Amino acid sequence: MTIKVGINGFGRIGRIVFRAAQKRSDIEIVAINDLLDADYMAYMLKYDSTHGRFDGTVEVKDGHLIVNGKKIRVTAERDPANLKWDEVGVDVVAEATGLFLTDETARKHITAGAKKVVMTGPSKDNTPMFVKGANFDKYAGQDIVSNASCTTNCLAPLAKVINDNFGIIEGLMTTVHATTATQKTVDGPSHKDWRGGRGASQNIIPSSTGAAKAVGKVLPELNGKLTGMAFRVPTPNVSVVDLTVRLEKAATYEQIKAAVKAAAEGEMKGVLGYTEDDVVSTDFNGEVCTSVFDAKAGIALNDNFVKLVSWYDNETGYSNKVLDLIAHISK
């Protein structure tokens, strides 16, 4: 059975989710809601400065998109309750506006006829968060869920492997994170985050992130053991997690590498990757794994204190896992 999906919000993640869905036979995008008009929507789908041209045909007819010959309903509703998802048979909504991240607000999609909702960002209430490679097995039929953040999707699978094999006493995470749409091209007002208002292309900007603490929500055994921060850097895409942990069980760096490699080739294949190549950030543009362990970049001070490095395409990897979560909750 094909899962029919509606996308609310056609920004970076909305568009990359759409692109990724074109490569799957189990998911069909049937509707998009955004305040953009259809012609501009088609243009932004066709051309992408980071990921290149859309691989397929995109046309506009009678105010709707025709992609690879299939009609996709286009609406421009501010209130999700008015979206009439049932008219196009939507099973799951990908909530990608960043605006409806509580059960109460996301539930408007259910009111409008959708069966389930996946938030493409960390929830702002107790809506459960699910990360592939960490806690998909804990899904218990909830109709509204969150796919957490791109950084949590990188950190959680790695942290799980390390904790399951060696035990984590405590840890600090830094993500060196590519620029995102909320940042400014030149210095501008940002009342809640003064540093965040500085020019994105000119600065390395320290920032807060809830990604490490969120790992404690998807992996309760790590609750209170991890926290972290971010540096926003002047690159358009691909980020990297630096996880420094104290281990319960002593392990050489070679043993850690072996454990991660085994997981990447086994139960976490497609989520966790492993490389011993001399890679840099652009090598991961378009990477669908949400966490690729860089064996050469990590270091150990001793057998109980290590720094581990893992790469992620914060757009492509995350968007593919949004689709995996949609498929998982539709079983």
Curated annotation (Swiss-Prot):
Matching Gene3D superfamilies: Dihydrodipicolinate Reductase, domain 2 (3.30.360.10), NAD(P)-binding Rossmann-like Domain (3.40.50.720)
Binding site for D-glyceraldehyde 3-phosphate: S149, C150, T151, T180, T209, G210, R232
Record GO terms (molecular function): glyceraldehyde-3-phosphate dehydrogenase (NAD+) (phosphorylating) activity; identical protein binding; NAD binding; NADP binding
N6-acetyllysine: residues bearing it: K132, K138, K192, K249
Domain of life of the native organism: Bacteria
Keyword Magnesium: no
Protein name (Swiss-Prot/TrEMBL): Glyceraldehyde-3-phosphate dehydrogenase A
Chain's gene name: gapA
